[in-house]
Amino acid sequence: MKRVSRRAFLRRLGVGVAATAAFSPLAVAQARRYRWRIQTAWDAGTVGYSLFQKFTERVKELTDGQLEVQPFPAGAVVGTFDMFDAVKTGVLDGMNPFTLYWAGRMPVTAFLSSYALGLDRPDQWETWFYSLGGLDIARRAFAEQGLFYVGPVQHDLNIIHSKKPIRRFEDFKGVKLRVPGGMIAEVFAAAGASTVLLPGGEVYPALERGVIDAADFVGPAVNYNLGFHQVAKYIIMGPPETPAIHQPVDLMDFTINLNRWRSLPKPLQERFIAAVHEYSWIHYAGIQKANLEAWPKYRQAGVEVIRLSNEDVRKFRRLAIPIWFKWAKMDKYSREAFASQLEYMKGIGYVTDEELKGLSL
């Protein structure tokens, strides 16, 4: 047998390693670069949009520049409520919406974010998505629409800004109220309010002109950025133990055109998923910090914070629970999502047998 010199062996070994590296998944991903256009629901000039821009920089960093995301604020390419179709048809590669916006066309999205008096803490929603099957339900439902649901993005509780004082449950009767739709709209409608769906950028002028009397839209920091304190001198919240009766965990998400997603090499898919999960908590923490800085500004602007009572919460709860079940029956994904959430709520003592009497899936 012919002997191979040490030098020749090392030379061949180097060639082999180089060849192996050249055909590794990461090297294949490096063979081309990808550029996505993603629009968020956050308006330019808000803390939310600033955080979104930082996320796009982080994606580039985590993918070594192989995936670049061009960020767009709300309305820059298409209207906020047109993002779904824009991503589906490829006008945009992806979106960062408030998930609940699609409840009218995908009822399950009403269960992919918090609803009146259901799960009310960010960690509970993380548990449901990542340990109780929620992420799988979301991805299967969105795949049928030609979309890939990457994951939820933690955000904030929602507060209501009002031009008139609302001091008890009965005061909602006749109020023209902007809400995000879905079950939340039905609960307020059952309480006697007249509900309207508007994107965030249209809330200020609607309040200013008196088109609406009050508006739910995210939390104090972004709402201050949008100038709500200038046109509405009341903020309506629940009691301390239930500060947001209607939407305590207002989740956003990242959704990508399914073909664009499938064209992305798996190593880059994994890094983007990791970036979204990381961003979820960075986004949440950034919003909370900004909220703490915003509250004193409301006081300086003369805005009064009104807290509803525990009795008001009980009245909303009596309206809300039957509406949960109504929405759960709208399609198979809604039923599957709510069934698992209901078991979770039972397990942590959030609902009683008495409250569920006569209701079934």
Swiss-Prot record:
In alphabetical order, the GO MF annotations are:
calcium ion binding; protein homodimerization activity; zinc ion binding
- Where does the record locate the signal sequence feature? 1-22
An example GO BP is: transmembrane transport
Any idea which positions bind Ca(2+)? 158, 216-217, 247
Top-level division of the source organism's lineage? Bacteria
InterPro entries the UniProt entry points to: DctP_fam, SBP_TakP-like, TAT_signal, TRAP_DctP_sf, TTHA0766
What keywords are annotated for this sequence in UniProt? Calcium, Metal-binding, Periplasm, Signal, Transport
Q: Binding of substrate: at which residues?
A: 101, 158, 178, 217, 247-250
Q: Which PROSITE patterns match?
A: TAT (PS51318)
Primary subcellular site in the record, as a coarse category: periplasm
The places in or outside the cell where this protein is found are: Periplasm
Alphabetical GO CC annotations of the entry are: periplasmic space; tripartite ATP-independent periplasmic transporter complex
Asked if the Swiss-Prot or TrEMBL record annotates the protein with the keyword Transport, the reply is: yes
What does the record note on quaternary structure?
Homodimer. The complex comprises the extracytoplasmic solute receptor protein TTHA0766, and the two putative transmembrane proteins TTHA0767 and TTHA0768.
Q: Which family does it belong to?
A: Belongs to the bacterial solute-binding protein 7 family.
Q: What does this protein do?
A: Part of the tripartite ATP-independent periplasmic (TRAP) transport system involved in the uptake of lactate. This protein specifically binds L-lactate.
Name recorded for this polypeptide: Lactate-binding periplasmic protein TTHA0766
Q: Which organism is it from?
A: Thermus thermophilus (strain ATCC 27634 / DSM 579 / HB8)
